[in-house]
Amino acid sequence: MLGEEASDIRAATFHSACVRILRRDIERLGYQSSFTIYDSDDSQRVIKACMTDLGISEKQLSPKAVLSEIGSAKDSLLNPDDYEERVGKDYRKTVISRVYREYQKRLFASNAVDFDDIINLTVRILTDYPDALEYYQNRYKYIMVDEYQDTNHAQFRLVSLLSAKHNNLCVVGDDDQSIYKFRGATIENILNFEKQYLSLIHISE
């Protein structure tokens, strides 16, 4: 495909597409558009500082494990309040809940986001600001997602929001090839696809 129409086609990962949205709209959430994206080492450094200031020993919980649990919470679109409500009497998760809350405060104070915030905050913008949602729904009228069986809840919610207006969504996936469950992939996203989109056309090899 050549010409002006082809220039409107964007190929991107979930995260690169969301970074583009955040650079334009993250100020709605109180961040600056020049926000920094922390990598795993940066995040663990902040987690360690939070744990130290909260009096939580690394012998009790490893910063890596805490960060992993927080990442899982973000993949499930659970903010610190949501996570705290769900921990119940689980002592380990109660401790992590305290770290999660402090961690997010420090990220915000540093105008920084971590890898899992990228999709999470984008979904928050699209959910809380109807004008932003409408803008991106019209910007992305046709959406195609590859390896759909490996999407997590946050990615599912993102795609659902963006495709809701025009309903032009194509997904490619095989429920027998899901390999990222350990990273939060939800096989139900593809198994329940036909229930969510009743007018779908199913093409198989």
Q: What are the functions of these language-model segments?
A:
Residues 1-142, 167, 185-187, 195-198:
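A basic/glycine-biased coupling hinge at the interface between accessory DNA-binding modules
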Residues 16, 149-150, 177:
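Short, glycine/acidic-enriched loop or turn micro-motifs at the edges of active sites
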Residues 138-153, 170:
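SF2 helicase catalytic motif II
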Residues 153-204:
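Conserved RecA-like helicase ATPase core segment
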